[in-house]
Amino acid sequence: MASRDFLGRFGGEKGASSDKAGGGAGEPDEVVELSLGLSLGGCFGANSGRDAKKPRLVRSSSLAAMCSLPGTSDDIAAATPPPAPLMRTSSLPTETEEERWRRREMQSLKRLQAKRKRLERRTSMNSGKSGGSSSRDDAQEPLYPSAFQLRRSVVDQGNASSSMPEQGSGDGAEAKSTSSMEISSDNNNQNKSLPPPAPSTAGKLPNGIVKEQPPLRTLRSLTMRTTSTGDLRKSMMEDMPIVSSKVDGPNSKKIDGFLYKYRKGEEVRIVCVCHGNFLTPAEFVKHAGGGDVTNPLRHIVVNPSPSVFL
């Protein structure tokens, strides 16, 4: 059976069928379609009358509501409901052109009102500042002198004190010291009598704390300071000169010191540089290794040159 011809098998069936057809009265000849032309309802255009009685494949749909069931066309039309209309979706809410224009107009009006309020607030603040500053200046002008006038008066006093002639070593030093003390006391009294100036708006911080402005330092003030320190050192040298011991002997040594300032009727004191002790002239000579001498001032020498310790 396996060795039989496949086409012969179909041919035998064809002959048998032809015999049956010949034996039948009005049956048409059945032709087997051997081609591969496939379709849903069979081969298109072949045996349409006979194939109409056979059940055909039903075309399916992607929508569940539109699926058709096997049956006649009238039954399908009656059982199938009409498809629902599809709704068009969008990401933004539907609104008319009038609503959109109305919303834009409201936004523009709000912006204009906010801008107008800011301008009014700024103008009011500027006018208040200008009025307050002008009234403050008018009130303070007749009461307090300006900083330039104070600086000029101090400079004039310093020039007048420096232009005074020197009358002598001791008298000149005393005059300079007294004049400098008077100038400093006058300046202190002026500074104490003057109230602190009103702080400017530029030195204020956002939290209301007033920041103090540092005083201005000019070249003239610096030169005056250096000259005053030089005069002070010179006056100290004149009041307390440097002395040294002049002793001859095997155990003698040179000791430096300075003559401490003393008044009339007081005993002369010499400060020893090596130990810092206050000694009398006899003790100073004895400290240098001279022993007990009758006239100790002869063994003490005054050095006119400034010392390295000052």
From Swiss-Prot:
Is Phosphoprotein given among the entry's keywords? no
Note whether Nucleus occurs among the keywords.
yes
* GO BP annotations, alphabetical order: negative regulation of DNA-templated transcription; signal transduction
Compartments where found: Nucleus
Listed Basic and acidic residues bias regions = 99-108
**Main location, first listed in the record:** nucleus
Please provide, in alphabetical order, the Gene Ontology terms of the cellular component aspect for this entry: nucleus
Q: Where is the composition biased (Polar residues)?
A: 156-166, 176-193
Alphabetized InterPro entries for the sequence: Ninja_fam, Ninja_motif, NLS_NINJA_AFP-like, TDBD
Looking at the record, which segments are called Disordered? 1-29, 68-140, 156-215
* Annotated keywords: Nucleus
What does the similarity note say? Belongs to the Ninja family.
Would you tell me the protein name for this molecule?
Answer: Ninja-family protein 3
> Which lineage?
Eukaryota, Viridiplantae, Streptophyta, Embryophyta, Tracheophyta
